[in-house]
């Protein structure tokens, strides 16, 4: 970089990095923390199709509004449409799902309003339930895969194989016109009665007209909600993601906390946040273009501040000096150990799930599962034949059927297989892994990653597998250099 004498060398480097595979990996880690991406959702199953879908969106540089819209309107089975994983993440908690959606994409912290009027923000419990009613036409079809497996079990296939086969076909997002939201039994306000049906209503912000909504076609409720939320006319949607990206680069958001933008006038610089919201709309929610603008600003290029001044807002004389994230630290170590070829090594377990999706219409009702019994076994037999012909199965009969679809992430990573970018490893890693020790999010709640550091991380850096591998790399490099020097000396003689 320093050898380059071009005046635009910095801008060129920014362009190069934003287009690199490493940036795609970095953005997946960032979104993984925001969207609570995990390999396995409780009672839902493996979500590898979601990982693959999200990475493809980043690779294609899909605009943020389109990406979010697709997640909110996704339909079908998890095994064939990875985007459904976003709604399936909180399938058993629809009110929490709405709360997380509003907090993540609009910076509207409405968690309190699930139980009572928000004490500090302009959100009532009625407002929350009226907004939640737009998810009322969404249902999550699932049946415990273990029970139908027992029903279907015979000598041809094991229970474990049937569970593996059924799971990607059982989890799906559908429209249910018979569903509706009602006020809770402990609703304590005079504007509605407990158990009363909620009439859908949009809650909008200043500068955006209240939408005309009809409930005659409940099928379109979620689509209407997603259209409104991601609309360029919705300033909160633009400002929320702009605020998040600003924090990613500067270490502190224009408005903190970034999950609560209800009082924008209290931001460190309200005019800056408004401008950033306009900017991201001007680039049509292209996250690469937006990041390119931020990274090329004189403000970002200024010397980093050690700590923000106490008792007053940060005026952004430059970014804050801060520790790298766990994923950035890990990826830097992996790059040292394995070199640039690391970006050519990808893990994709989605095909192992996608191949289990039934090629026929299937409704996950217990009685209908039994009716489809022979179809299911015929499909399983086809898969078994394919597996045996390609030597994927090491066992006879049906005992080893489909086991490769889950084995990849359960097997302990060894040797070079463990030195992959964080985005290619299990999401998240186990508690004892360096990534977790260094602050990787557990993905239980959004934005849970930490850059605080601590004694455990320091010890891991000095005495753990990372230190041993780095020292081994240094030793190998020194040995190679000595051999090269000896060879050169021998040639001269």
Task: State the predicted function of each range.
Residues 1-22, 35-416, 436, 441-449, ...:
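Primarily short, surface-exposed interaction patches in extracytoplasmic proteins
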Residues 26-29:
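Conserved AdoMet
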Residues 51, 426-429:
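A cross-family structural signal marking well-folded subdomains
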């Amino acid at each position: 970089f320093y050898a380059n004498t071009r005046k635009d060398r910095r801008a060129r480097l920014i362009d190069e990095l934003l287009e690199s595979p490493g940036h795609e990996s970095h953005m997946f880690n960032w979104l993984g923390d925001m969207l609570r991406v995990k390999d396995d959702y409780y009672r839902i199953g493996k979500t590898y199709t979601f990982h693959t879908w999200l990475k493809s969106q980043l690779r294609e540089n899909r605009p943020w509004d389109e990406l979010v819209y697709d997640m909110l309107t996704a339909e079908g089975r998890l095994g064939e449409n990875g985007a459904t994983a976003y709604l399936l993440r909180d399938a058993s908690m629809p009110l929490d799902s709405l709360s997380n959606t509003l907090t993540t994409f609009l910076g509207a912290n409405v968690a309190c309003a699930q139980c009572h009027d928000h004490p500090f923000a302009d959100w009532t419990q009625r407002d929350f339930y009226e907004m939640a009613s737009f998810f009322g036409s969404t249902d999550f079809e699932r049946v415990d895969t273990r029970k139908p497996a027992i029903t279907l079990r015979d000598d041809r296939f094991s229970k474990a194989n049937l569970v593996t086969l059924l799971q990607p076909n059982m989890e799906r997002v559908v429209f249910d016109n018979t569903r509706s939201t009602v006020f809770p039994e402990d609703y304590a306000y005079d504007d509605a009665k407990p158990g009363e049906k909620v009439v859908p209503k949009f809650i909008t912000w200043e500068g955006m007209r209240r939408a005309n909504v009809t409930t005659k076609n409940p099928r379109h409720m979620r689509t209407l909600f997603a259209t409104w939320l991601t609309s360029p006319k919705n300033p909160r949607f633009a400002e929320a993601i702009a605020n998040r990206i600003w924090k990613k680069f500067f270490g502190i958001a224009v408005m903190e906390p970034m999950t609560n933008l209800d009082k924008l006038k209290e931001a460190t610089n309200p005019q800056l946040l408004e401008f950033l919201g306009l900017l991201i709309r001007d680039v049509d929610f292209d996250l690469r273009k937006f990041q390119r603008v931020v990274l090329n600003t004189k403000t970002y290029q200024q010397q980093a501040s050690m700590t923000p001044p106490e008792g007053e807002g940060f005026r952004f004389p430059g970014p804050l000096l801060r520790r790298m994230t766990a994923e950035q630290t890990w990826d830097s170590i992996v790059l040292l150990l394995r070199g640039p070829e690391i970006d050519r090594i990808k893990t994709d377990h989605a095909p192992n799930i996608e191949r289990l999706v039934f090629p026929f219409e299937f409704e996950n009702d217990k009685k209908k599962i039994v009716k489809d019994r022979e179809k299911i076994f015929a499909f399983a037999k086809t898969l078994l034949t394919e597996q045996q012909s390609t030597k994927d199965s090491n066992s006879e009969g049906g005992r080893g059927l489909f086991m490769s679809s889950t084995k990849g992430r359960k097997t302990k990573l060894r040797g070079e297989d463990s030195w992959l970018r964080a985005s290619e490893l299990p999401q998240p890693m186990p508690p004892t892994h360096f990534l977790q020790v260094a602050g990787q999010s557990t993905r239980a709640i959004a934005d849970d990653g930490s850059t605080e550091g601590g004694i455990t991380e320091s010890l891991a850096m000095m005495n753990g597998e990372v230190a041993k591998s780095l020292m081994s790399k240094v030793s190998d490099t020194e040995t190679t250099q000595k051999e090269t020097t000896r060879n050169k000396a021998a040639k001269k003689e």
